[in-house]
Amino acid sequence: TEVPFTINKANLTIAAENMNTNVNSVVPAYKFTSLGLVGDDTLDTIFSCEYTKDSDVGTYVITPTDCTFTSDVKNNYNIEYVNGTLSVYGSSYNKASKTVKIYSNHDTDVDCYVVSYAENGTLDGIKKEHCSLKADEISTIDISSLNIAENDSIKIFLWDNNLTPVEITN
């Protein structure tokens, strides 16, 4: 006598891990966690993210888009993908709007000095701005008063309450 039976698919959750990097850094190797793999099944995940080495400070969604198994078992799973967040810390300069954005991973009060250099490397101008940085919030500083020329370069220095200068640009 035959007895009918049904084998249900296992539920599998693949979650992109939240990650941090600094502005102007190479794209990190995204990581994931999985919950629900059965037996010796293993997998690898493919991600998409808008972040590139030239991206601005801020947050970007890390999206797991697909997965591959070491054996042909993908059809045995109901797969749910969970996005993660890439936080890009540091500072960036927007030439068009003449603003500097600073994205910090901790709360702190700082004095921000934006120093501009002419194309030949001579000092062109300095602007000081006091900032109360909040963790994971973007602060924007208007530096249009520096009259930065197209080929000038800038460096941004932060001085915290301990008077420790930190250069946060290349």
Regions found by a protein language model. Give the residues of each.
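Solvent-exposed beta-strand/loop surfaces, strongest in extracytoplasmic domains of secreted
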Residues: T1-S91, H106-D107, A118, C131
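Solvent-exposed serine/threonine-rich low-complexity stretches and specific carbohydrate-binding patches
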Residues: D124-A135
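Exposed aromatic-hydrophobic patches
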Residues: T99-K101, E137-L146
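Surface-exposed, short loops/turns at beta-strand junctions within beta-sandwich domains
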Residues: K53-D56, S145-E150
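Short acidic/polar inter-strand loop motif in beta-rich domains
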Residues: D160-I168
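Structural beta-strand segments of beta-rich domains
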Residues: P28, A96-V100
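Beta-strand signatures of extracellular beta-sandwich domains
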Residues: D111-Y117, K155-F157
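Short, surface-exposed ligand- or partner-binding patches at beta-edge/loop junctions that are enriched
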Residues: I148-D160
